[in-house]
């Protein structure tokens, strides 16, 4: 699929630093440097305001046209990339025909700039502009709508914040964003799940509709033994996208022979988890959810919904082409891109693997160690959150409560907080806390000094414990990042006592 005329341009040979800077928030690779379009407003620091435009766009997916949303940055490409030390000073312009609100996933802004539709921070009306200005944290992040089901209609994009170390490393940067896609409207997909099971969405009717009309819902199951079945996929999607394209027309990213690449992987899918396979290559995982981890070597990595991975790859010196493939857990379907030396012939990878991918498990999570863990400290407050729900009736809850009728998890500024999440269901739940980076400290009650991150997968019939410092007062959403689970109730709030 082709969303621009970029593929008609002859590749421009740049050095690695130029390649990294040119990549911007583009979905990948070696694009020419483009003029930066900035709004006229300036922050208190004097920095010009970057413009981010939310609006509609057209894709071709498997030969068919589709009208979707997009978040287009100042270089005309999806998303935003910031230089080391640059503030997140952004003017969000809503050119869509409906209201929206954009969440800066994994970033730690003041709560009124987080991009969640609290009464105090309502969605941005069509035609309006809203400014954001805060000091970002470096790493691989992303942005997506928190308005209804707009995320499923591709209202999402990368958010990359470079560090000084990134610049010194002088690696070619490749951003790979994964998404799931259906020609049906998200509301139709949700209705297929809830109405067939006799339930209705728990989300209130507050004008938070998707505003975009573009499979029917079904469940894929895998036998776990002992008569139990793991539910992996709620939706039968029409396609899985890598940088807006399928393997019918994959993006080919040209690299230097023997080049050094930093692959930034973003799972922006609404209800799909992937196994990322580097094929003939080996890589070194150096960060998860934007936060550095001690190096983990490998060629195959799990990637839950909303999570990110940074993988360093040293390419062979020859004139080769190397597919980077993401296979859907529990399915043969896959998507991906191709890294290829300039002049190398490229073969189109098969859209299906030879066998179904296994479920995402804890094999990687147990190995992860934060480079900068939280300082040792006993928790001042502990919360237990029970994850419950079922496919029939289709409804998902936290502590037996369905959003918005919830009891907040209360914390106070300065506390060390621990949250134990117990998954009583046969589905995995990627749990995301807004406004904080937490550390994983136990899996199935077995202690570990795990990764610092913002989204952790809680596998079926298991538990995960996280801890964080309550250092960002406000109201913060805490939810499953499977959009269909969240829309049917699987969300609560972490609220500071100062907000009462």
State where each predicted segment sits.
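N-terminal secretory signal peptides
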Residues: 1-14
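Asparagine-centered strand-capping/turn motif at beta-strand->loop junctions
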Residues: 92-96, 266-267, 421-425
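Histidine- and aromatic-rich segments of cupredoxin/plastocyanin-like copper-binding domains
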Residues: 113-118, 122-124, 223-363, 443-451
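Extended terminal and domain-junction accessory segments
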Residues: 21-22, 29-51, 153-213, 291-428, ...
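Extracytoplasmic/lumenal soluble domains of exported proteins with redox or metal-associated functions
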Residues: 2, 38-154, 162, 206, ...
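A contiguous, surface-exposed recognition patch within enzymatic or periplasmic domains that forms
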Residues: 177-274, 377-380, 396
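Extracytoplasmic beta-sandwich strand-turn segments characteristic of Greek-key/jelly-roll folds
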Residues: 75, 79-82, 106-137, 168-170, ...
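Short, hydrophobic/aromatic beta-strand segments
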Residues: 100-105, 272-278, 430-433
